[in-house]
């Protein structure tokens, strides 16, 4: 399905190495890009408009890391400019981009979004709970 829309597929054959390995695979594959937008697949209420707003904020401030947030709580999607790729490539274990953001708080720009859009759903029970509260 991804190919139908012009997207490539990158498979992580070592998920046991943690989130950092997934980030490194994507970063290596897109190393020639000016920035990378990282997203997770378990935010069912994330709106396409939010992704567009995060991208627009990065276009306005391309030297900044841009992340969706609600009341100061950061989440995904998040865009990292190329200059941060080396730091993303050396993350280990289940460490994500937050480790890079913590080292560069002055370079972070957030886009305020509804809390529900940042909801991370990892289990059927979590999905049922989220649907219950909608």
Say what each PLM segment does:
Residues 1-74, 104-114:
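Nucleotide and nucleotide-moiety/phosphate-recognizing core
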Residues 75-86, 124:
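Conserved nucleotide-sugar donor-binding
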Residues 44-45, 84-86, 116-117:
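Short histidine/acidic/glycine/proline-rich micro-motifs that form metal-
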Residues 45, 79, 120-121:
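Short aromatic/basic micro-patch
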Residues 90-134:
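Conserved alpha/beta core of the MobA/IspD/sugar-nucleotide pyrophosphorylase nucleotidyltransferase superfamily
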Residues 9, 87, 120:
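Conserved beta-strand positions that form and line the central face of beta-propeller blades
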Residues 20-23, 51, 85, 94-98, ...:
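A general structural signal for well-ordered alpha-helical segments in protein cores
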Residues 73-75, 80, 96, 116:
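A conserved catalytic-core signature of glycosyltransferases
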């Amino acid at each position: 399905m991804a190919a139908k829309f012009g997207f490539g597929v990158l498979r992580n054959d070592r998920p046991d190495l943690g989130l950092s390995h997934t980030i490194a695979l994507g970063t290596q594959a897109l190393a020639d890009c000016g920035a990378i937008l990282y997203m997770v697949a378990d935010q069912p209420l994330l709106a396409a408009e939010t992704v567009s707003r995060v991208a627009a904020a990065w276009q306005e401030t391309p030297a900044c890391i841009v992340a969706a947030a609600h009341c100061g709580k950061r989440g995904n999607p998040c865009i990292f400019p190329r200059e941060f790729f080396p730091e993303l490539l050396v993350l280990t274990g289940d460490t994500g981009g937050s480790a890079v953001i913590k080292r560069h708080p002055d370079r972070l720009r957030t886009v305020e979004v509804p809390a529900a859009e940042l909801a991370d759903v990892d289990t059927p029970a979590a999905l049922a709970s989220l649907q219950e509260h909608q």
